[in-house]
Amino acid sequence: MNYKTVDVILERALLGDDISPQEGVVLLTQTDSGAIASIRATADKLRQQQAGDTVTYVINRNINFTNICEQHCSFCAFRRDDGDADAYWLDWAGIREKSHDAVQRGATEICMQGGLHPQAQIDGKSLPYYLKLVETIKQEYPQIHLHAFSPQEVQFIARVDGLEYVDVISALQNAGVNSLPGTAAEVLDDEVRRILCPEKINTATWLEIIGTAHKVGLHTTSTILSGHIETPEQKIGHLEKLRSLQQTAINHKYPARITEFIVLPFVGQEAPKSLRRRVGRDQPILADALLLGAVARIYLGNWIPNHQPSWVKLGLAGATEALTWGCNDIGGTLMEEHITTMAGAVGGTCMEVATLQNAIASIGRPYQQRDTLYHKVDAAKKLANTVMSNG
């Protein structure tokens, strides 16, 4: 593909136009270093226009409440069967302890997800168990933002209890869930999903659950798991579905929408052998993740202005570099993260705030703490949170 075509696409993007799926594929398949440099520069300029120069971060904690799961996704090294030596399931005291620790350390957000544990029920029902998870945290820490339960978990609860998705989402929201993680998306293409995660929800169900959350006023994030068996066309198809979903939320004036987009590069080190062989490497290729991040900024930025790399997947140096390829946020402190780390990632499981701040400062950009919904967290709010947690 010649420079002229790439330049024309990038010029249109800089004028504020949405690029087409075909144009997205053109950008994503560039191998010429000059063309890639132009894509990076355009993404960086759009990031500046759409999200500003300040790089944000969030103080949060991950709670993966169980690794027992009925599914067998081909990329997952986290799941265990009930009875495995290293299977675990946190009790209520464990949930409270981790929540207390998070708040003491200044967290404004708890991100909670877990395996699909068939025994995670109260009186033979799934939803009451999940509601108790929420209430266990919210009764003690009503001020914490609870970012919890993927579309896959929503579908699991609905299936087990014979409920509609909207009823599950509304019940979780009423109990205190503040936003839904847009995980379990992997690649929104059923051909890929049949190989990667055949037991998981299909593309239409993922889109339906996220769209339903927006309708009832629950914000969500969005993600892509990239760098395994998917094609450039399938990656762009994924971005197109997300853009369309966000356009629907905005055009229909739904009370909530997608707050951010995160590229999650595939980590294969501990993945099952069949997928490792097929992918042919254990760690993400940084250049591929950076290019996808840049194209995602160009493709989605008019509609989803906040873009985040994964320091867990890429390491902090890789994530910092992504801030010059279209990203405006460096994510959270996490405090612990089991799923990616068990897959063999090199990024680690916890970041101190100062470490994130120093990484941002190293590229000459200002930094700012934010909350889950990208509001600035100021000193007064931090103080109020600490007082409430010590009260």
From Swiss-Prot:
One of its GO terms (molecular function) is 5-amino-6-(D-ribitylamino)uracil--L-tyrosine 4-hydroxyphenyl transferase activity. Its EC number is 2.5.1.147. Keywords: 4Fe-4S, Iron, Iron-sulfur, Metal-binding, S-adenosyl-L-methionine, Transferase. It catalyses: 5-amino-6-(D-ribitylamino)uracil + L-tyrosine + S-adenosyl-L-methionine = 5-amino-5-(4-hydroxybenzyl)-6-(D-ribitylimino)-5,6-dihydrouracil + 2-iminoacetate + 5'-deoxyadenosine + L-methionine + H(+). This is 5-amino-6-(D-ribitylamino)uracil--L-tyrosine 4-hydroxyphenyl transferase. Catalyzes the radical-mediated synthesis of 5-amino-5-(4-hydroxybenzyl)-6-(D-ribitylimino)-5,6-dihydrouracil from 5-amino-6-(D-ribitylamino)uracil and L-tyrosine. It comes from Nostoc sp. (strain PCC 7120 / SAG 25.82 / UTEX 2576). Pathway: Cofactor biosynthesis; coenzyme F0 biosynthesis. InterPro entries: Aldolase_TIM (IPR013785), CofH/MnqC-like_C (IPR045567), CofH_family (IPR019940), F420 (IPR034405), FO_synthase_su2 (IPR020050), rSAM (IPR007197). Binds 1 [4Fe-4S] cluster. The cluster is coordinated with 3 cysteines and an exchangeable S-adenosyl-L-methionine. Its cofactor is [4Fe-4S] cluster. It is an enzyme of class 2 (transferase). Belongs to the radical SAM superfamily. CofH family. Residues 55-302 form the Radical SAM core domain. The lineage of its organism: Bacteria, Bacillati, Cyanobacteriota, Cyanophyceae, Nostocales. [4Fe-4S] cluster binds at C69, C73, C76. Consists of two subunits, CofG and CofH.
